[in-house]
UniProtKB/Swiss-Prot annotation:
EC number(s) given by UniProt: 2.1.1.297
UniProt function note: Methylates the class 1 translation termination release factors RF1/PrfA and RF2/PrfB on the glutamine residue of the universally conserved GGQ motif.
Protein's organism: Yersinia pestis
Protein name as catalogued: Release factor glutamine methyltransferase
Alphabetized GO MF terms: nucleic acid binding; protein-(glutamine-N5) methyltransferase activity; protein-glutamine N-methyltransferase activity
Keywords, ordered alphabetically: Methyltransferase, S-adenosyl-L-methionine, Transferase
InterPro entries according to UniProt: DNA_methylase_N6_adenine_CS, HemK-like, Methyltranfer_dom, N5-glutamine_MTase, PrmC_N, RF_methyltr_PrmC, SAM-dependent_MTases_sf
Upper lineage: Bacteria, Pseudomonadati, Pseudomonadota, Gammaproteobacteria, Enterobacterales
Keyword S-adenosyl-L-methionine: yes
Family: Belongs to the protein N5-glutamine methyltransferase family. PrmC subfamily.
Residues given in the record as substrate binding sites: 182-185
One Pfam family cited in the UniProt record for this chain: Methyltransf_31
Amino acid sequence: MNYQHWLSLAAARFTHSDSPKRDAEILLSFVTGKARTYLLAFGETEITAEQLLWLETLANRREQGEPIAYLVGEREFWSLPLSVSSATLIPRPDTECLVEQALARLPAMPCRILDLGTGTGAIALALATERRDCAVIAVDINADAVALARHNAEKLTIDNVCFLQGSWFEPVSGRFALIASNPPYIDANDPHLNEGDVRYEPHSALVAAAEGMADLAAIVSQAPGYLDPGGWLMLEHGWQQANAVQELLKNSGFSAVMTCKDYGNNDRVTLGQWAV
């Protein structure tokens, strides 16, 4: 069987996927070690028997709904190839909106940045890459996530970021010009938890008590004790939680509170500035 034939058959199997053709190309690229552009340009190339066996195993798992990122162990975020595992949430493109807002509000001079619930290290590494003059601290309660984030930093030779294990602000001290977080914010009863890729991701990285608001509220309540005067707090949240997060920030004394849209035009990131 050649590349072109396998891609066609695989894409037809991935009916549950939003991007079946892309999924097939990623799997074939992973197994053959060839770039996706090569696969399309040389579609008549024959696949070896060993590669076909491996591809069939991966295709079966994808057909059952297992995320592509877990199958190949990698997901790109902010043009950074990040290793991923089942211990972490898979980085989403919409989280890049938070990175954009953070970069737009960081002071021009070197400063300290805090990323809470870092997972793969996506937000921390993106900010550390763009602002090599800044010191980035990133925290996660999951030891496996911290180890993975450190691996990503080493792989990408990013040396201005430090990863710590602990619950939210517990392992950190001092103040920061900006605190960013993509915490768990999904209600435990949300039916979407039983659909698509989310079924395979760790619920501890997705679900929060109090209808998804508990961790957001905990971060907002503690953040003033860790922000520089004029510092910013930026939170990713669910598309229906913007008003609730805005109220949390305003009630805690934040000003310039606003919500930004994601790439799908949904409310996704709410931010506020601590008193100057």
